[in-house]
Amino acid sequence: MDRREDALLQALQTNASETERWEAFKRDNESTIRNLDKFAKNLSVEVMVPIGRKALMPGELIHTNELLVGHYEGYFSACSSHKAKEICQYRLKLAEEQLKKLAVENDLWQKKLHTPFAEGAVPSGDQVEIVEDFNEESHNKWLAEHRKRMRQQKQKERLEREAEPVKKDNEVLRKLEEREMMEELGLDPDNIDEDQLHDMLNQEPLKSTNESSPKSLTQEEEDELWKKLEAEEQNEADELSSEAEESLKTTDNLVRQLMSGETETPSSKKRTAGTNRNVEIQDPISEDDGDDDDEGDQEEEVRTIREQMSLLPNEDREPFLRAQLHVLKAKMRKIQKVNFISDELIHLMNVVVMLEDDLQDLVFEQELEASEEEEEVVENNHLPDEPSKELSTVSESSTNKRRISFALDDEKLEFRREETVAEMLPNAKKNSRDIIKLNAPLKPAGDPQPASIKTKRQTTQDILQKVERNIEFVKENQSVQDFDLLNRIMEESTGLINTLHISFTHSGAIPSPSSDQSDGIPGKPSDFYVRYEKDRARPNDSFPIYVNGFEGEEHVKVPIMSEAARGSAYEDPRSQFSKPNSSEICFTHSGSITPTSNDQSDDIPGNPFDFYEKYEKDRAKFSKSNSSEGDATDPESATKSILRNKSAVDLEPHNVNQQPKKGRKVRNQKKKERTLDDDLRDMSAYQKVMHDLVEKEPTAPEPLPPGKFIDSHAPKKRVSRFKEQRALNKT
C-alpha cells in the first residue's frame, strides 16, 4: 500500500508541474495577442529598452507590422502581425486542450488515491476485514445433494402435468367466448351469477338450431312463423304508449315501401308548394340548415354516388340514380331474408332515404325547366285580353322557383379549344335578357305588366350559328390586306426597281409626216427611236440608279466617275491655298506717262507701276535662264516617251509643291534662296485668304470644288430601309 501511495503521489506531482508549465504558456500567448493588437494600430511604439540586467532606456519600436516568429530548433519565420496573431491563437487552443487532459488525469489519480479509504475498501482505524473459511470437501458434498434435490423436483412437476386433463385449451377458448358474450349483452362479468351464465350457455345450441331451421322451412311453416311474429309485435304494441305506437307504424310502413320499391317521399319543395308566401320564405332557410347538419352525417355510399353524379350530364343523372336505388333495394331484400332487423339494414335504409331525396330534387328541377319553357311559349303567344291569367301563372311559377342552394364541392372549369362556353358549363343557368321589339303592338297603360319577361334560352346550335355569321361578315366587309399586314410590309420593304429595256432597229424607210401629234407624244414606233437618240445626245448629269435604292441615297454611296473627275473630287480642298498661281495677279497697262521719282531705289517699288516693271524684268530673266538650261540639258526632247497614256498623265492634276523626302545625307545642305515667284505666290495666298475673311459672311460654309465626293472624316449615316419605307407609306 505504501508503494502504491508513493506512485500515485509522484504522478500527482508530475501532473501539477505540467499544468503549471502549460498555464504559463497560455498566459504568454494571451499577452502576445494583446501586444499585437496594440502595436498593429501604430507605425511605431514607445517602449523602455533593457540595457543589461538593471538598466533601461527609452526607445521606440518600428516596423510593428513585421514580426519574426520563433519555431522549434532555432527556426524562425518573418510574417505580418495578423499572421502572428493566428499562430498565437492556435497555440492558445493547443494549451487549453492540454490543460483539459491534465485536469482529467489529476481527477483520476485523486480518485485512485482517496477512494479506497472513503468507500471502505481498505480498513482504517477500528475497521476489520471480513474473512470467511472455505472447505472444498464440504462444498463438493453440498453440490451433490443439490443436484439430487433438483432431479426429484423436476420428476414431481412432470407427474403433475401428466395428471392434468387434456382439454385445457378448450377451456381457455370457452372462457374467452363467455367474456365476448357478456360484452355483447352488456353484462358485468364481476357481478353476474354463475348459474345464470351456465343456463345461457346451455341454451346457445338450441338457438343455433332454430336459426339454421328457416333455411329448410316450407311455405306453410314460414307463414306460421310470420303470424307468430306479428302476434308478438301486436302484444308489444298494446303495451306501448300512443306516441311510440305511431312511430312504430310509420317505421313499418317505410320499411315495407322500401322493400316493395313503391316509395314516393314528398320532397320539401312539394310540401311547401301549397303554403303561403310567409312559409315559403322560411322553408328554404330551414332546409339549408338541415343540409348543413346532414353534411357531416352523410354516408360513404351517398357521398360516392353524388360524386359520380356530378361528373355526368343532366340527362343521365336521373337514370343513374334510379339504377343505384334499385341495386340497394335488392340488397336490402337479401339481408332481410337472413335477419329481419340488423345494423346493415338500417344503414342501407338511411342511404336509400337520402338518395330518394336527391331523386325528388332532380325531378323537381326538370319540372321547373319544363314549366319555364311552357311559360316562354305562353308569353310569346299570349293575348292582351288575358292579363289576369298571365299574372296568376307568374305568381305560381315564382312560388315554385323559390329556392336557395349551395354547391357541395368546388367546380372546376376546363377550357377546351374545340368546345363553346355553354358546353364547358353544362350546369350553368344562363341569364335571360329582355328583348325589345320595334314592331310589337302597344299595350294599354292600365293593363298590369308581368313581373318578368322571359326570353328563349340560347342553345349550343344558336351560338355556333352566330359565330358563323360573324365570320362571314368579317370575310365580306374587312379588307384582306388587314389580315396580311405583315406580308404587305415585307413586300414594300423588299421591292425591286425593274428597268424596261427596249431595243430598236433602224429602218431606212421614210416616216410619213404627221401634223396631229405633238413632239412629246410618240405616235408610232419610230418616235421612240427619235426620242431615244435625243435623250442619248443630252448630257446625263443624273445620279446612277441603284437596285433597292431610295431618295437621298446619293449622299451615302460612292458615285461612279471617270479617273480625271475622281482625282479632282478626292483632292483636299486645303491644297488650293498652297498652289502657286501667277495668273491671279492681273495688271492692266495704261498709256499714261509715269512720273519720275529720284528718292527711291530701284529695288523698292514706290507705286503699282513699279510692281509691273519688276514683274516684267524678273519674267524675262526667268524665261531666258530656262531656255538656256533646256537647250543644254533636255535629252527627252530628242527621244520618244515610254508612257503609253501620256496625254492622260498630262491631264491629271499633280501637286507641284510635292518634293522628295530628304534623307540624312542632305540635312546639312543650304536652304534654297527665295525668288520673286515665291513672294508672289505667298502674297496671292494671303490676299485670297484675307478676301475670303472680309467679304464672305462668317456663317457661310467654305466652298467645295465641283464634283460629287464623300467626306472621309465624317461618319456615315446608317439608314434603315425598313424605316424609310415605313415613313413613305405613312405619307
Swiss-Prot record:
Q: Specify residue ranges for compositional bias: Polar residues.
A: 205-217, 508-518, 575-599, 623-644
Q: Name the source's superkingdom.
A: Eukaryota
Where is it located?
A: Cytoplasm; Chromosome; Nucleus
Name a single GO biological process.
intrinsic apoptotic signaling pathway in response to DNA damage by p53 class mediator
Q: Which residues form a coiled coil?
A: 91-115, 143-176, 220-258, 357-379, 452-477
Outline the segment boundaries, as ranges, of region: Disordered.
Answer: 205-224, 259-302, 370-396, 508-527, 567-682, 694-731
Which intervals carry biased composition (Acidic residues)? 285-300
**Gene3D superfamilies cross-referenced by the UniProt entry:** 1.10.287.370
The alphabetical list of record keywords is: Chromosome, Coiled coil, Cytoplasm, Nucleus, Protein phosphatase inhibitor
One CC-aspect GO term: nucleus
The entry summarizes the disruption phenotype as follows: Embryos hatch normally but first instar larvae show very little locomotion or feeding and die soon after hatching. Embryos show transcriptional defects with reduced expression of ebony and Ass. Somatically-rescued mutant larvae show defective germ line cell viability and differentiation with damaged DNA.
Return any one Pfam family short name: Prefoldin
Which molecular function terms from Gene Ontology are attached? chromatin binding; phosphatase inhibitor activity; protein phosphatase inhibitor activity; transcription corepressor activity
Basic residues bias: start-end ranges: 661-673
According to the UniProt entry, which residue ranges have a biased composition of type Basic and acidic residues? 611-621, 721-731
- Mitochondrion: is it a keyword of this entry? no
- State how it assembles: Interacts with serine/threonine-protein phosphatases flw/PP1beta9C and Pp1-87B with higher affinity for Pp1-87B.
State the similarity comment. Answer: Belongs to the RNA polymerase II subunit 5-mediating protein family.
Function noted in UniProt: Inhibits the activity of serine/threonine-protein phosphatases flw/PP1beta9C and Pp1-87B. Required for germ line cell viability and differentiation, normal transcriptional activity and maintenance of DNA integrity.
Q: What is this protein called?
A: Unconventional prefoldin RPB5 interactor-like protein
**Which gene produces this protein?**
uri
